[in-house]
Amino acid sequence: MGLEVVVPRVASVELAALLDGLGAAGLPSALAMVDNVLQGPGAIPPAVWRDARIRTPAGIVTLRRVPSGVAVVVFGNADDALRAAQRTIAETLLALH
């Protein structure tokens, strides 16, 4: 079971812009997987996606499109550092729109 934060009404978000925003917010991150396809270093993120995994220094965070926006999900046993990364990603998503 995961811990989920839903960022409401985020219609579309460019993953490259999100990664740039996270770097500016002090959370250097990389794209690990998009729609069940592994992403290598330097891979260009697709413009359209349903599910993405973001690698942060604290661990992996899942982004999943839901009808009400984008869900930012971590494992239920996430430590404080991973929960902080989850909040930073949610805040950055909100700031992009």
How should each PLM-predicted stretch be described?
Residues 28-56:
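Ser/Thr-rich, low-complexity intrinsically disordered terminal regions
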Residues 1-31:
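Short, extreme N-terminal segment that most often corresponds to the first beta-strand
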Residues 17, 23, 38-39, 54, ...:
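Low-complexity, compositionally biased segments
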Residues 47-97:
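Charged interaction segments
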Residues 1, 20-25, 39-41, 58, ...:
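Feature targets compositionally biased, intrinsically disordered low-complexity regions
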Residues 18-20, 31, 35, 74-76, ...:
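Generic detector of ordered, mature protein regions
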Residues 22-25, 34, 41, 85, ...:
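Low-complexity, intrinsically disordered/propeptide-like segments
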